[in-house]
């Protein structure tokens, strides 16, 4: 619709609503993602893995399927390789039996069929573990972060930084410094309860130095108003070795070889799974389902070319 502006020239008002094509593509991607999660989660859970995130993107003529898995007690490259074989079998139709559907449907099936693969054509499968700095979304993420330094942004905008002492299904207890560290003086901390329902975003902080205080022991306050003297007994489960002698450097020996700066994950707290940023995963296995008879060596990540 044309209209005359103040300058006397005609202006054209254009619609800013999203196109149907964009909305349709997003809906189709969400449907494929949901179908992948529905198929993969039962098998991964049975094998002792948690499916943290799954996504599908396009890279030229191929699709890139990225699956993030974790498990209690930590995950190493061997475990990631096991998860990769399991995911590959499910996607290739070798282990789709949870819904009692018919045959595998052949290669490149559409997502709508119960027995067909949700991925059309050739694809690259990436199975990774979460990065150290991944967002804390589920209670299990908090339990696995016990002993780590986290930053929490509450729904009211207040930020809290502290070390996770313990976590349950409702919230976590943090040891929060009450004052800046002073040389020759013990650092005093208070125990603050963080309820998951009040959290807008929370993430583990990457620590390249020691997690301990270099100067003396650490005093922990029972709450914001009452201080416990050094050596006083803490509530059950709260004393996790905050002292200089008993704390463990979880990142000892890690070096930033590539010189890249760490970036905060911009995913919202409510995003399902809380996938880690690219490059931050501890271990990764990549499979290319579209080439023939090519093998790459194991150098921190495993590449395997497969014919689908």
From Swiss-Prot:
Compositionally skewed regions (Acidic residues) per UniProt: 249-269
Compositionally biased intervals (Low complexity): 17-31
Protein's cellular compartments: Cytoplasm
Pfam family, one: RimP_N
GO cellular component, one term: cytosol
Extent of Gly residues compositional bias: 99-113
Family: Belongs to the RimP family.
Name used for this protein in its record: Ribosome maturation factor RimP
Organism: Parafrankia sp. (strain EAN1pec)
Biological classification of the source: Bacteria, Bacillati, Actinomycetota, Actinomycetes, Frankiales
């Amino acid at each position: 619709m044309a209209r005359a502006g103040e300058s006397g020239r005609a202006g054209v008002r254009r619609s800013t609503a999203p196109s149907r094509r964009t909305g349709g593509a997003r809906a189709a991607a969400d449907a494929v993602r949901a179908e992948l999660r529905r198929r993969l989660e039962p098998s991964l859970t049975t094998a002792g893995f948690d499916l943290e995130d799954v996504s599908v993107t396009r890279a030229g003529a191929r699709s890139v399927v990225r699956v993030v898995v974790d498990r209690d007690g930590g995950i190493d490259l061997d475990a990631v390789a096991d998860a990769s074989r399991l995911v590959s079998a499910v996607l290739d139709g070798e282990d789709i039996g949870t819904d009692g559907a018919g045959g595998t449907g052949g290669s490149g099936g559409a997502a709508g069929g119960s027995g067909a693969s949700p991925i059309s054509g050739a694809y690259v499968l990436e199975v990774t573990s979460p990065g150290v700095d991944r967002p804390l979304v589920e209670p299990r993420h908090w339990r696995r972060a016990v002993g780590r330094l986290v930053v929490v942004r509450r729904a009211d905008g207040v930020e809290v930084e502290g070390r996770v002492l313990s976590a349950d299904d409702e919230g976590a207890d943090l040891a929060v410094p009450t004052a800046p560290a002073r040389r020759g003086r013990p650092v005093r901390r208070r125990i603050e309860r963080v309820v998951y329902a009040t959290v807008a975003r929370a993430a583990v902080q990457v620590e390249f130095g020691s997690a301990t205080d270099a100067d003396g022991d650490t005093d922990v306050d029972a709450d914001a108003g009452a201080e416990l003297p050094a050596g006083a007994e803490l509530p059950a489960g709260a004393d996790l070795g905050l002292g200089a002698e008993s704390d463990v450097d979880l990142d000892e020996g890690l070096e930033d070889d590539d010189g890249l700066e760490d970036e905060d994950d911009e995913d919202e707290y409510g995003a399902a799974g809380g996938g880690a940023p690219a490059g931050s995963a501890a271990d990764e296995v990549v499979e290319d389902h579209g080439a023939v008879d090519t093998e790459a060596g194991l150098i921190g990540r495993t590449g395997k070319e497969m014919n689908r």
